[in-house]
Amino acid sequence: MSTDHFADFAPNKTPFTSLIASRDGQNFTYESLHDRVPHILTDIINAYFTAIQDYDGPNKDQAVAEGKQITSELSKLKHEMVTDKPLTPLEDDGLGDTHVWNDWLQKFFPGGTWYTTPFLTWETYMYRRIAMIFKRSEHWNSFDFFFAKKEATFKASKVAVAKLCKRVDELTNECLGDIENTTKLHVAFIELLQASLWGNQTDLSMFPDLDSAKIEEMQARISSGENNAKIVSNDSEKIWEIVSTLSGGRVDIVLDNSGFELLQDVLLAHWLVKVGYAKHVVFHPKRVPWYVSDVTNEDFHWLTDSMRNPHF
């Protein structure tokens, strides 16, 4: 593909339909490929190295040997990334979409390298290839190399979690006590929806080094509502128009980040069911560990189990 189709990224000036690559040394996409994403990959390698050392399951010798091979493949991936090698085809790992990825890369970006392939393509390719490396293993195919970071981030959110749960409980009881008051229902829904939106601030693929103080600061802004004026495109009212017509229906929520944002999604679902707008809420997690903090099925159950545990 000719590089004429690509555009150098400038904040608020991205040409419509142009592809954004990472060639320019002064933009976010370049910084992502040069610093942010290699840092994430290094964190994966370090977390996995610790997991190998701590492994005490069956067939330990085989698992450790396999772990060393996986570490080598992850290091190879990082080397290819930072030295701008071509994106190589994925190997079959049983997930069923390998051919889709390979056909896409061959059709649109044949011979494309990390710095010449579009930003969104190479970053999603990286997470998919990491998943392939683990899925093709025997002992580590279900290992979540991001779990420890997701767990620590949620535990660091305990103050905001307590405030959020208390607030949702208050909103729910207020609405149930005056269920015919559509204005009250409307205001409560918008508050919950926008709180769920701002939970995205704890996206660990964008902020891999968040400490507990920064997390508390960001989550305090969510609780205060001061962020809402910064929403660039706000269709909350259109969503309310749809939700307000439901009566015991089904609502689907496509999950993004685990931990605090997931809890907000669950509490929004709780409110929708309690006040009668939904009878069923279906959550859609990711199939594999993705973009550091995205929700997997295991993350969902870990959070709900943790919230039930009085000693958590």
Regions found by a protein language model. Give the residues of each.
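Histidine-anchored nucleotide/phosphate-binding helix
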Residues: 261-282
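Short, conserved secondary-structure transition motifs
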Residues: 287-299
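Gly/Ser/Thr-rich loops at beta-strand to alpha-helix junctions
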Residues: 117-121, 254-266, 287-290
